[in-house]
């Protein structure tokens, strides 16, 4: 009851009152170990990306790809980290997989342009 009273102002502000009111349990759902770990890794990912710590970021991306095998954006992001570290061929593989699997992605053209640039680098070596 006390928790519900503390939440009421927030619920009012978000429009979750009246006919749209959700039971308190909906807000207190237990997170799975996978959800907790992926949240932790994504927080580290944001930190390392912001700090441009590419080697550490790559380690996080490797873990995210394993933990979330269906999350193709994590494969894309691993490819971007690989490119920053000049691991061109694996970066190309990841980016190609991303655009092949998500041809309607909002960043398709940007990733495709980076992919073309990386493929040019391979041809010149």
Predicted features along the sequence, with ranges:
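A structural boundary/capping signal
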Residues: 1-125
């Amino acid at each position: 009851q006390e928790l519900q009273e503390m939440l009421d102002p927030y619920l009012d502000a978000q429009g979750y009152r009246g006919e749209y009111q959700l039971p308190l349990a909906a807000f207190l759902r237990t997170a799975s170990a996978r959800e907790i770990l992926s949240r932790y890794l994504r927080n580290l990912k944001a930190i390392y990306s912001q700090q441009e710590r590419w080697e550490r970021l790559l380690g996080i991306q490797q873990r995210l790809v394993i933990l979330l095998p269906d999350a193709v954006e994590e494969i894309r992001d691993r490819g971007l980290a690989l490119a920053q570290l000049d691991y061109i061929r694996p970066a190309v593989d990841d980016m190609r997989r991303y655009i092949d699997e998500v041809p309607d992605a909002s960043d398709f053209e940007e990733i495709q342009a980076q992919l073309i640039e990386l493929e040019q680098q391979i041809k010149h070596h």
